[in-house]
Each structure stands twice: as C-alpha cells, then as structure tokens.
Amino acid sequence: MKIDTFIFLMFISIGILLLLLNIINPMEVFHIVEWKTIFSLFYLMVIINIMRDTKFLDYISLKILKKSKRIFIALIFLTLFLSSLITNDVSLFVIIPLTLIIHRYTNMPFKDLEKLIIFEGVSANIGSGLTPIGNPQNLFLFHFYNIGTLEFIINMIPFEIFGILAILPFLEFKKYDTKINIDIKFKKEWIFYILSFILVLLCVFGYLNFIYILPLILAILMYKRVKVDYLFLLTFIFLFVDIEGLKRIGIINIFSIKCGNVMLMIYASLLSQIISNVPATVLLSHLYKNWLPIAYGVNIGGNGTLIASFANLITLRLSNGNVRVGRFLLIGGIIYIMHLIVLVAYAKIFWV
C-alpha cells in the first residue's frame, strides 16, 4: 500500500470509529463539514484534470519552454506559476512528465535531472502558497476564516518572495542544448474548459453559488472520463469529522499551546512535518483565531519530510526512479529550514 493511501485510510478510519462510537451522530456530519471547501476542491479537480488530460496544460507549457534555452530555470518558474493557479499536485502531474520528455531532447546530465525534479516538487509547495486555490490547506483557510482574495494574496507575498530567494542559490542557470520537436495543436474544445474554469473560480471566490454550476460539472463527468481523486475528497470530509470528534472528547486540547504569532508559525510548520500540512491546517484552525501564522507555517512545512505534503509523495511517484529518497529529504529539509529561519526573522520585525 502506498504511503499516501495509508494516510488517507487512517483519517477515514478515525472518522468512522467516531461515528460508530456515537461520539458524533451521522446526522450531524452535514453541518460539521465545510462544504464550500469540498465543492471547491471537487470542481477544481474536475476542470483542471480534464485540461491536463486533453493536453491543454502541455500546450501552454511547451509554448513557454520553446522560448528558453535555460530549461532548468524555465521549468522551475513554470512550476511556481502553475502551482499558484492549478494547485501544487496537478502542476506536478503536468511538469514532471513534461520534464522527463524534454530531457530526451537536451544534453542535461542525469544529476541535473534529479536536482530539477526535486526542486520542481519544492517549488510546487512554495508557489502554491501564494493563492487561495494553490493548495487544499489554503483553500480551507480561505473559506474557514472568510478571507478576501486580495487580502490573502497580499499577505502571502512575503512567503512567496522569501521562498523563491531560498531556492535561487541552488538552481542551475546554465543553458542546455535543446531540440524540442513536440508540437501540440490548439483544440476548440479547450475554449469550453477555459470558460468552465473561469466559472469555477467565480464560485471559489464567492461570486457564484456552487449549486449553479453543479450540473455543468456533472455533465462533464458523464461525457468525459475525468480522473478525480475521490479518496482524497473523502479524506478531507472525514478530517472535519475527526477534528470535531477530537474536540468533543478533549484530545484536541493537547495540541493547543499558548503562543504568539511567530511561535504559532513555527509550531504549524513542525506539526506539518509529522501529520502532513492539510490535517495540521484543519486541526490548528479550530484552536487559533489568526489565520496568517497558520498559513505561513503549514506552507513552509510542506517541504521537509515525505508526508509533510502530498506533493512530495507525488514528486517521488512521478520521477520514474530518477530521484533518490535521501537526496530528496536532504534538499527539502535544507529549504524548509532556510525558509523558516528567514520568515521567523521577517515575522519578528513586521508582525505585531
């Protein structure tokens, strides 16, 4: 069993146990779950995955890459950009396979390929921290704390800037000889998916009711074979059940410590290393009123251990054996520590 599947099933099992023990009545689940977050994730998964499956994301990526010989840097910044718009997980499903294809048409050494794939994983975690739709934890915080879109992005800019500065010294700026002869022609069906994506964004940001475009999403699922990670969605639903159950039996208070904003950021980042950043986000949001230290902490904490972020597991899974686990942990750990130290210094100066 894959480690991410094991983690998902563990959280689901805890929720089922809480229901069986009648700590939570099954009828209460509807009111406990943050359905805005669930529907946001579901809609984004459907639209973004179909854009990926129909090669629209490959089309955009290749258009950008064909204009650059500095493939290493181009792919890293493409990852940073895409992960802020289409989530860190999906961006990796586009970028890493594309990287492996492009590698065949370059003179890039395998050690640089390994380094590139690792930093694509790291960059996906950093880039996704900028926007409410960049990753599941941001999407949850966005709805749970009722944060404005612009407010969220402006507050996360320092996180993004210092994250990019942390990885820059390690990147390869040299040029590689490239002969990218892959050609993808524009498809008319993409226009429909682009418009659907815009409608989904309007829902996520509160301009449209989620019910209005549910028929559209269901129609797409009926007529197209779209891969949706239903296990992840189910896990997210049960996370709300888990947290409510732990709150009722008093265990959640174990995770509550008296701390200021800077210490909360550090705490959130460390907790993410142990239980992964999505569960850490849901847990801490029920204990603390200030969203920003949690957002910084869980996004910093995405890099480091394998389970810190699901994006880390995806990076290794997609690398086709080109990445050593030890090397991945070393680089991820170094970036985590550097990013945390710099943001602690920033927070001590600018946070009240």
Curated annotation (Swiss-Prot):
GO terms classed as biological process: transmembrane transport
GO cellular component: membrane; plasma membrane
Keywords: Cell membrane, Membrane, Transmembrane, Transmembrane helix, Transport
InterPro entries noted in UniProt: Cit_transptr-like_dom (IPR004680)
Major subcellular site: membrane
Compartments (UniProt record): Cell membrane
The name this protein goes by in its record: Uncharacterized transporter MJ0456
Organism: Methanocaldococcus jannaschii (strain ATCC 43067 / DSM 2661 / JAL-1 / JCM 10045 / NBRC 100440)
